[in-house]
């Protein structure tokens, strides 16, 4: 899945650059510039749909990649793992600020709700939120800085990816048995490059199918309405890949408690290398750990379902 994530990143950066050429980061123009892109720019509709749904595939791949890493004990490569978690956090930040850019109803209210969470931080919270907004509400300054972040962060992700790979190459990658694989080493090209092409095809075909046949399947219809600070949508919810965290946030009545639980749900990944006590690396021969692992997977799926 690592190679697929690399492909996702490249695809997203290319489509994103093409979109940025036609996008206007201004509250009065953002929504219309996106509409103009889909109507008047050559293949603009396709580029936009690939970019929007590419994010979903990025998250599918990263969640599978993390799950696979937990299952096979890859987190024992501590540096690689920790940089991976930082990569996940950066990706989540990028996806969040990107979702705000079309400036539809859900963009605006999503930005309002999520940035507001920073006000739960004791003492500095309120100042921090006003500093983040560039004013007393989500408005033009917020949109322009979010565009700047959304442009910058993917390159940060690309840089971190190289560091991630550098640390991985210190030890070599893990395998399903969790044992050294020195005797099985083979040249990357042509063997792995051909093997990866299969994965590329298996990811790109569903992505293109989704972008061409039902591009709005995963989006929120609320985002077809231009942002209106005076009308709150009936239900504010993020894209599906954040629903598990959003469900945790919403289920706790206390604001600070919810924010802490939301943060902890992702930051817990940093602790996993410290919690490993087994003599075996992988879960292949540990039925009890397997039960716990699949319970975790089921939990996340149920949270995602409940969150919607």
Swiss-Prot record:
Its main location: mitochondrion. Its cofactor is heme b. Changing residue 40 to D: In strain: Isolate California-168, Isolate California-169, Isolate California-170, Isolate California-171, Isolate California-175, Isolate California-176, Isolate Idaho-1, Isolate Idaho-2, Isolate Idaho-7, Isolate Idaho-8, Isolate Idaho-10, Isolate Idaho-11, Isolate Idaho-12, Isolate Washington-899 and Isolate Washington-SOA. GO terms for biological process: mitochondrial electron transport, ubiquinol to cytochrome c. A ubiquinone binds at residue 169. It is found in: Mitochondrion inner membrane. Gene3D superfamilies: Cytochrome Bc1 Complex, Chain C (1.20.810.10). Changing residue 32 to A: In strain: Isolate California-168, Isolate California-169, Isolate California-170, Isolate California-171, Isolate California-175, Isolate California-176, Isolate Idaho-1, Isolate Idaho-2, Isolate Idaho-7, Isolate Idaho-8, Isolate Idaho-10, Isolate Idaho-11, Isolate Idaho-12, Isolate Washington-899 and Isolate Washington-SOA. The chain crosses the membrane at residues 1-21, 45-66, 81-101, 146-166, 194-214, 256-276, 288-308. Component of the ubiquinol-cytochrome c reductase complex (complex III or cytochrome b-c1 complex) that is part of the mitochondrial respiratory chain. The b-c1 complex mediates electron transfer from ubiquinol to cytochrome c. Contributes to the generation of a proton gradient across the mitochondrial membrane that is then used for ATP synthesis. This is Cytochrome b. It comes from Corvus corax. The lineage of its organism: Eukaryota, Metazoa, Chordata, Craniata, Vertebrata.
């Amino acid at each position: 899945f690592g190679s697929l994530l690399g492909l996702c990143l490249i695809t997203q950066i290319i489509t994103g650059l093409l979109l940025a050429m036609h996008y206007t980061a201004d509250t009065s123009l953002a929504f219309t510039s996106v509409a103009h892109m889909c109507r008047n720019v050559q293949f603009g509709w396709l580029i936009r749909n690939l970019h929007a749904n590419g994010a979903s595939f990025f998250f599918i791949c990263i969640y599978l990649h993390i799950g696979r890493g937990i299952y096979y004990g890859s987190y024992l490569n501590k540096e690689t793992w920790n940089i991976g978690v930082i990569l996940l956090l950066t990706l989540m930040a990028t996806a969040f600020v990107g979702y705000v850019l079309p400036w539809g109803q859900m963009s605006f209210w999503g930005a309002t709700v999520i940035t507001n969470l920073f006000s739960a931080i004791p003492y500095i919270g309120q100042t921090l939120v006003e500093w983040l907004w560039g004013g007393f509400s989500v408005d033009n300054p917020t949109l322009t800085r979010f565009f700047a972040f959304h442009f910058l962060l993917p390159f940060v992700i690309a840089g971190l990816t190289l560091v991630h790979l550098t640390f991985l190459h210190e030890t070599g990658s893990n395998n399903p048995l969790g044992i050294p694989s020195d005797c099985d080493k083979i040249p990357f090209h042509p063997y792995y490059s051909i093997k990866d092409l299969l994965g590329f095809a298996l990811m790109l075909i569903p992505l293109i199918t989704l972008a061409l046949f039902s591009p709005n399947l995963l989006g929120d219809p609320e985002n077809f309405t231009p942002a209106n600070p005076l009308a709150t949508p009936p239900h504010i919810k993020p894209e599906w890949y954040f629903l598990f965290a959003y469900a945790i946030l919403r289920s706790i009545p206390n604001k600070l408690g919810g924010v802490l639980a939301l943060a902890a749900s992702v930051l817990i990944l940093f602790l996993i290398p410290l919690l490993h006590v087994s003599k075996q690396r992988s879960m292949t021969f540990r039925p009890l750990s397997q039960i716990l692992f699949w319970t975790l997977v089921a939990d996340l799926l149920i949270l995602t379902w409940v969150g919607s």
